[in-house]
Amino acid sequence: MKNLEPKEAYAYLQSHPEAVFIDCRSEIEYLFVGHPAGAIHIAWQDSPDWDVNPDFLGHMRIAASVNRPVVLICRSGRRSADAGRYLEKHGFPEVYNVAHGFEGDMDEARHRSTRNGWRHDGLPWEQT
C-alpha cells in the first residue's frame, strides 16, 4: 500500500478515472463532518462498538472488484491504513491510503483541519 498526500491522491483520482475512492469513516463522520466529493462510503468500523465491519470486504468487492485501484480515506489516515492492509491481504493489489485523512493531524490545541488533510488542503468536499 502506498501513502499519498491529499493533493497527490486528488491528482491520482483525476488521472485514473477507473480508481474507486472509498471513505471508510463511520456513518456519522461521513454525514455530519463532511466527506470528499465523489467518495463512496463503506465504513471500516462503526458505532456503537467500533468493531471491524463484517461486511466491509463484501461491500468492497461490489464497489471496486480486485481489478480496480482503491484509494481509501478516513479522518486521519490510520483506519484507512488498517483497511488498506486488510484489502491487500484479501487480494486487492493496488491500494492507496490518503495520508492525514480528511481532517488531518491535531494541532497543539487538539484541533483538526488546521495542519493538513483533505479539507485543510482545499480539496473538493461536501456535507450531507
Regions found by a protein language model. Name each.
Residues 1-19, 27-69, 80-128:
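Rhodanese-like catalytic fold shared by cysteine-dependent sulfurtransferases
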Residues 23, 77:
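Conserved G/P- and acidic residue-centered "switch" motifs that form tight phosphate/ATP-binding loops
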Residues 72-73:
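Short, surface-exposed ligand- or partner-binding patches at beta-edge/loop junctions that are enriched
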